[in-house]
Amino acid sequence: MPCPSFRSGTDQQDNRQENMFVRKIATALALVIASTGVAFSQSPTRIQQFNDWGAYSYQAGGGKVCYVLSIPKEKAPSGVDHGDIFFLVSQRPGQNISYEPQAMMGYPLQENSKVNVTIDGRNFVLFTKGNSAWVENAAEEPALVAAMKGGKAMSVKAISRRGTETNYTYSLAGITAALNQIETCK
């Protein structure tokens, strides 16, 4: 029979931080599903957490959708309400979509603006629509995903509809394991 474990004050604080992270992720799941514009028959399920990246799945009309998602470690400028900010990479085998990176902001992006993602000095340009952004040149999606797997941190710069320049820093710890987890998504 397993022994009971007791949480120290630090463990309780870690648990509160984890619960806050899970609540933010739950919000992200709802946003991801809403952004697909597809009715679904099943709520998203968290498959597993890998450091700063979680792996998730849900059933959609076109089949199973799997994705990895993280929230930024740092947000700038500090004096503005950013809302819920996420970066995710989705895979939709039923629609022949593999590893599609997407930035989701908690605010509308400036029309016709670009979002710049930088990893280890390499820049990727994303086009915007509403509060989301996708890789401008789909042929660069695999290169962005490879850079994420090989990098330590990722910077995402955007401009809000109001003209506020924003910058987010994401940890890439766990991205490779999370992507490996959804590789078998069918």
Task: List PLM regions with ranges.
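A generic "folded-domain core" signal
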Residues: 41-186
